[in-house]
Swiss-Prot record:
Name of the protein: Exportin-2
Species name: Danio rerio (Zebrafish)
Gene deletion effect: Morpholino knockdown of the protein causes strong expansion of the gut lumen, due to excessive fluid accumulation.
Top-level taxon of the source organism: Eukaryota
Coiled coil: none
Xref: Pfam families: CAS_CSE1, Cse1, IBN_N
Chief location bin: cytoplasm
Annotated compartments: Cytoplasm; Nucleus; Apical cell membrane; Basal cell membrane
Cross-referenced InterPro entries: ARM-like (IPR011989), ARM-type_fold (IPR016024), Importin-beta_N (IPR001494), XPO2_C (IPR005043), XPO2_central (IPR013713)
Cysteines engaged in disulfide bonds, as pairs: none
Any single Gene Ontology cellular-component annotation: cytosol
Length: 971
């Protein structure tokens, strides 16, 4: 694309159309941009639109499009074309910083994100001047520019908070500190001075406090991995100023908004985080400053209101206290009973209260409430912080803390009992306090795994939880009922089984609750209970125990999906999946009705897939329906095809990218259930599966390969007879896959199925070309993964067509090549083959080479006979060689960037491991002994002579054992 006004105008028009609410206008525009983004100058044109357009909306749209383009395409992935030309990369890096700093804030944020994406790949090695260019802008004195630099630096450096330690990381952080730490400190001091100068200018203060917050975030990132020498030397400057800012109260910066945190709250929140980091990780160096921070943060907590805008500040302040009280260094600060009582009364109990804002979220923003409460994204909530503080205090003072809090729990429950209708929030806080007190260790899988022995969880369940679960009106007091359900879920590993069984039918009844939170919690609790393990690796709750409630459970789960707000509730769908899995054949009578409901739901969500987890569990539930029903009666497979194929056809025709990989997996499962034939409906689809466009998306590759394997397994003869013109297309797919380090193993899966199932004559003309392609890949890019797959393939070929055919095809490509492959690949590398089936294939293939290939006995290949036998005995007896060369680098499929749908494996569509040799060989060691006996009978004296002169003693001893086990001997 040329850099000219015409192209700028065209691009502007298409960007405008991507903003249209009409899909008929929007989608073609999106497709057009997708089709041209591979052209040189495309990103430069986007930046030109961003810079020159008079329309602010178009400028922002261009910035967002540019950022997403960078996100998808900047990383260079091995085996894949470079999607951005080198001149474009250079031009982007030369211009983007200046463009970002001179743009309005909305655009600045997008470009700042783009810089951090580029920086993640290129900084510092391929973009060495980035930091210097940014630091130089500190001198500008323009805080719009300075904040742009700080924002970009923050997005660039925040990954230091969660990266694993490595020499490469240390080198990068050292470079950043050497260039950035001193200017950042000077800027920090200068900004604080300016705050004092402009103490009465609200507009100036807003900009300056934004800067201070960003500077504080950078401090956190740069200090996270280790305490840098520079910051240790300058601790006085940073900590004194942090403390002053923490105690600052400027009326101008206070906001009337009760929801949104103001600049002062955001800054103080970050300073609490910074202090907590130092208290936790660098307690020795931080000790002189700790008492004044404890005092300042304590004062902050007891003087800050209950408004939502203070939530982040209060939770970070409490987290600071939690991190301090857990450290043995600071234990003395909390030993006094009065201190513990004061913390409980003034900090913990007030911040555990269920506020009107929480009630609003529970009723009107249930999805966010659930994510926060169930999935642990409540990291910034007051309740979570208060709970962490309770746990921290219990580390050293479990007895006193439990005693103090038990008094509060009892008084809260007494208040509730006086007037439940008015005082229900007291019981809510009591349950939360008990949960905090009792929880010592928790996992997603098991709930609470270690509990405070001073809290009787079972007694609390009987006295206070069961009554809410049993309440005949499921819609009364939804918060308390949700609390009760969550209590069962949280303490499921601590409560006795009889109490859990008592809870199950009650939880089933709560699936009917109108409250989204309540019926979601009920579904989630049931799903978690159904995954608990009992003795002998079985489920704790058995299908027999569920029998009285099975119909009600399935009915209520599917009805819950019809409650407004829960039509795509992932917790309900996961509970459906888990119920199917637990109940197994008990669901068969209900499937004719339920499959219609599942299919209808699939049709609806395929119009606009927006809930990936819901969709995944929906497909898992379909797979379970198919597996369980067809296990009992394989003939029912046709009724599933009848129900599902119309929806599948629509999904494939509309190219619903998120669902296509799932459809292929379910089709594979269905096809694999058929006896050895392919129905015509599948054969009609076969040519479409070979279209190159389908194979462009990495997420399609594993399920498509499996589906093609199912076609070959069930109908290779039919393909050879009626669709032989498609065999080149099938091999074209293999050729594409084999060229990629990420997908070569998938290419071998396909090739092995072709060799195993296709009639020999159907692929004779292609065999030589297949081997040539494999050799070209071996020469150009040999990896351990490829070699292992190659070994399995050539040995399968030996098993299928015979060792002579294998030797001849190698030597036909190039004289003596067979010997080279045996010597350079098979003998040294076979020890690396992993997997029982793979090892068996290699063993049987090598046995055939040793005993059924005359060239191994009568030509220059004879010298390889004993080493090959030794390698085979090593495969049987030695541990697997899992070493990988130092310089080898595998591309992980999940690591490939971009917006493509990643492959999501359906657990319940799982394919059974296939053994192409099967029962024909049960023990390869016995087969070796029998085959050597047969060979020695054909040429007496030769085999013992070769063994005695060339095989090491240890290998001979193993071989002797095989011969004895097979009751044969060599002659």
């Amino acid at each position: 694309m040329e850099l000219n006004d015409g192209n700028l105008q065209t691009l502007t028009e298409y960007l405008q159309k991507t903003l249209s609410a009409d899909p008929a206008v929007r989608r073609p525009a999106e497709k057009f941009l997708e089709s041209v983004e591979g052209n040189q100058n495309y990103p430069i044109l986007l930046l030109a639109v961003l810079e020159k357009s008079q329309n602010e909306v178009i400028r922002v749209c261009s910035a967002v499009t540019f950022k997403n383009y960078i996100k998808r395409n900047w990383r260079i992935v091995e085996d894949e074309p470079n999607k951005i030309s080198d001149p474009d990369r250079t031009a982007i890096k030369a211009n983007i910083v200046n463009l970002m700093l001179t743009s309005p804030e909305q655009i600045q944020k997008q470009l700042s994100d783009a810089i951090s994406i580029i920086g993640r790949e290129d900084f510092p090695l391929k973009w060495p001047d980035l930091l210097t260019e940014m630091v130089n802008r500190f001198q500008s004195g323009d805080f719009h520019i300075i904040n742009g630099v700080l924002r970009t630096a923050h997005s660039l450096f925040k990954r230091y908070r969660h990266e694993f330690k490595s020499n490469e990381l240390w080198s990068e952080i050292k470079l950043v500190l050497d260039t950035f730490a001193q200017p950042l400190t000077e800027l920090f001091k200068a900004t604080i001075e300016l705050c004092q100068t402009h103490a009465t200018d609200i507009n100036a203060l807003k900009v300056l406090f934004s800067s201070l917050t960003l500077i504080s975030k950078l401090f956190y990132s740069l200090n996270f991995q280790d305490l840098p020498e520079f910051f240790e030397d300058n601790m006085e400057t940073w900590m004194t100023n942090f403390h002053n800012l923490l105690t600052l109260d400027n009326k101008l910066l206070q906001t009337d908004d009760e929801e949104e945190a103001g600049l002062l709250e955001l800054l103080k929140s970050q300073i609490c985080d910074n202090a907590a980091l130092y208290a936790q990780k660098y307690d020795e160096e931080f000790q002189p400053y700790l008492p004044r921070f404890v005092t300042a943060i304590w004062n902050l907590l007891v003087t800050t209101g209950q408004e939502v805008k203070y939530d982040l500040l209060v939770s970070n302040a409490i987290q600071f206290l939690a991190s301090v009280c857990e450290r043995p260094h600071y234990k003395h600060l909390f030993e006094d009973q009065n201190v513990l009582t004061s913390i409980c009364e003034k900090v913990i109990v007030p911040n555990m209260e269920f506020r009107s804002a929480d009630e609003e979220a529970f009723e009107d923003n249930s999805e966010e409430y659930i994510i926060r409460d169930l999935e642990g994204s409540d990291i910034d909530t007051r309740r979570r912080a208060a709970c962490d503080l309770v746990r921290g205090l219990c580390k050293f003072f479990e007895g006193p803390v439990t005693g103090i809090f038990s008094g509060y729990v009892n008084s809260m429950l007494a208040e509730y009992a006086k007037n439940p209708g008015v005082n229900w929030k007291h019981k809510d806080a009591a349950i939360y306090l008990v949960t905090s007190l009792a929880s010592k260790a928790q996992t997603q899988k098991h709930g609470i795994t270690q509990a405070n022995e001073l809290v009787n969880l079972s007694e609390f369940f009987l006295n206070h939880i069961l009554i809410d679960l049993k309440s005949p009106n499921v819609n009364e007091f939804p918060v308390l009922k949700s609390d009760a359900i969550k209590y069962v879920m949280t303490f499921r590993s601590q409560l006795p089984k009889e109490q859990l069984l008592q809870a199950v039918p009650l939880l089933v009844s709560h699936l009917q609750a109108e409250s989204i939170v309540q019926h979601t919690y009920a579904a989630h609790a049931l799903e978690r209970l159904f995954t608990m393990r009992g003795g002998n690796n079985t489920t704790l709750i058995t299908p027999t125990e569920m029998a009285p409630f099975t119909e009600q459970l399935l009915n209520h789960l599917f009805k819950a999906l019809a409650i407004p707000g829960s039509s795509e509730n992932e917790y309900i769908m996961k509970a459906i999946m888990r119920s199917f899995s637990l109940l197994q054949e008990a669901i068969v009578p209900y499937i004719p009705t339920l499959i219609g409901q599942l299919t209808h739901k699939l049709l609806l969500v395929s119009k606009n897939p927006s809930k990936p987890h819901f969709n995944h569990y929906l497909f898992e539930s379909l797979c379970l329906s198919i597996r369980i029903t067809c296990k009992a009666n394989p003939d029912t497979v046709s009724s599933f095809e009848e129900a599902l194929f119309p929806v599948f056809t629509e999904i494939l025709q509309n190219d619903v990218q998120e669902f296509v990989p799932y459809v292929f997996q379910v089709m594979s499962l269905l096809l694999e259930i058929h006896s050895n034939s392919i129905p015509s409906s599948y054969m009609a689809l076969f040519p479409h599966l070979l279209q190159p466009v389908l194979w462009e998306r990495t997420g399609n590759i594993p399920p498509l390969v499996r589906l093609l394997q199912a076609y070959l397994e069930k109908g290779a003869a039919a393909i050879a007879n009626t669709a032989s013109d498609k065999i080149p297309g099938l091999l074209g797919v293999f050729q594409k896959l084999i060229a990629s380090k990420a997908n070569d193993h998938q290419g071998f899966y396909l090739l092995n199925s072709i060799v195993e199932h296709m009639p020999a004559e159907a692929i004779t003309q292609y065999r030589k070309q297949i081997f040539i392609l494999l050799f070209q890949r071996l020469q150009s890019s040999k990896t351990t993964k490829f070699v292992k797959s190659f070994l399995v393939f050539i040995n399968l070929y030996s098993v299928k067509y015979g060792a002579i055919a294998l030797q001849e095809i190698f030597d036909d490509i190039q004289p003596k090549m067979f010997g080279m492959v045996v010597e350079k690949i098979v003998i040294p590398e076979v020890q690396k083959v992993s997997g029982q089936v793979e090892k068996k294939i290699c063993a049987v293939g090598i046995i055939k080479i040793l005993t059924e290939c005359p060239a191994m006995m009568d030509t220059e290949y004879t010298k390889l006979w004993a080493p090959l036998l030794q390698a085979l005995i090593g495969l049987f007896e030695l541990p697997e060689d899992d070493s990988i060369p130092d310089d080898e680098h595998f591309i992980d499929i999940e690591d490939t960037p971009g917006y493509q749908t990643a492959f999501s494996q359906l657990a319940f569509a799982g394919k059974k491991e296939h053994d192409p040799i099967g029962d024909a060989v049960s023990n390869p060691k016995i087969l070796l002994a029998q085959s050597l006996h047969k060979l020695s009978t054909a040429c007496p004296g030769r085999v013992p002579s070769m063994l005695s002169t060339s095989l090491p003693t240890e290998a001979l001893q193993f071989l002797q054992g095989y011969l004895q086990a097979a009751t044969v001997q060599l002659v």
